[in-house]
Amino acid sequence: MAPVALLVIDLQRGVNDPSWGPRNNPSCEANIGALLDAWRSEAQPIVYVRHDSIEPGSTLRPGQPGNDLHEMLADEPDLLVTKHVSSAFFGEPDLAEWLRSRQIERVVMCGVQTNMCCESTARVGSNLGFDVRFVLEATHTHDRPAPDGGMIDADTLARVTAANLDPELCRVVTTAEAIEELGARAPEPARGLS
């Protein structure tokens, strides 16, 4: 079986800080857990991505407790990428180089925020020639202000991300579909986005 990398993007303690506002998909972490279990059981590569914000006051700034990875990511990954921009492909070490050196062509993405770092990483990964799977129900995001002064709720942002990506840039899949494609049998994932 060709290796398939799981990218867990920005699942850090600070993303659930109340300052981020209301979020969607309370099943996100359970679905990420199901993906991690499947990847570990198949001995497939796992990449954690950590956002090291350079913004003053950010909960994800290095040295802040919110910069730490979520406790469910306590196991050592095959690679830890750190970044301060939205795409994991512009972090350190070079993610594309690492994947290519291991003949990894397919990447499965999950994490936070659906419409920001996850979408950006999916777009760049696709542009670089990787076969991308985007596990929408294993991502979450937060309500966001619109330029016109209104608010866009997190569920709408997630749906728009899925429409933006699939089918031109990647395939949006469920947790179960990602696990089935991997060939693993893992615990039944939690369902839904809300």
Which residues fall in each region the model found?
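Early exported N-terminus immediately downstream of N-terminal targeting peptides
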Residues: A43-I46, D52-I54, S58
